[in-house]
């Protein structure tokens, strides 16, 4: 089986939703999205990208660095979309990491 995988730094899922829908229309098996900028409470929006795909995501965050650099907007956010009829199972595993900003030795 050939597997088509795509990764895309979408710099806002909402701003690039049509391009992302184009990826699913191209029969990509798995689509990884970075910088979705979707907050945790908006991850349900992933289900509306394409009815033939399942999805899982991690919400964007607000941090002091993001607030200063991004004029108060969140940063980050990840998502994975995969075909519902795929011959594999996807399990979501969350590893909580809390980055520290500033000087590093």
Predicted regions located by residue number:
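Short phosphate/oxyanion-binding micro-motifs
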Residues: 1-105
């Amino acid at each position: 089986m050939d597997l088509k995988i795509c990764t895309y730094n979408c710099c806002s899922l909402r701003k690039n939703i049509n391009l992302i829908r184009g990826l699913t229309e191209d029969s990509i098996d798995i689509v990884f999205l970075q910088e979705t900028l979707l907050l945790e409470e908006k991850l349900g929006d992933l289900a509306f990208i394409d009815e033939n795909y399942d999805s899982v995501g991690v919400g964007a965050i607000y941090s002091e660095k993001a607030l200063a650099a991004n004029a108060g907007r969140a940063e980050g956010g990840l998502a994975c979309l995969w075909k519902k009829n795929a011959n594999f199972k996807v399990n979501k595993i969350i590893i909580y990491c809390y980055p520290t900003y500033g000087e590093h030795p």
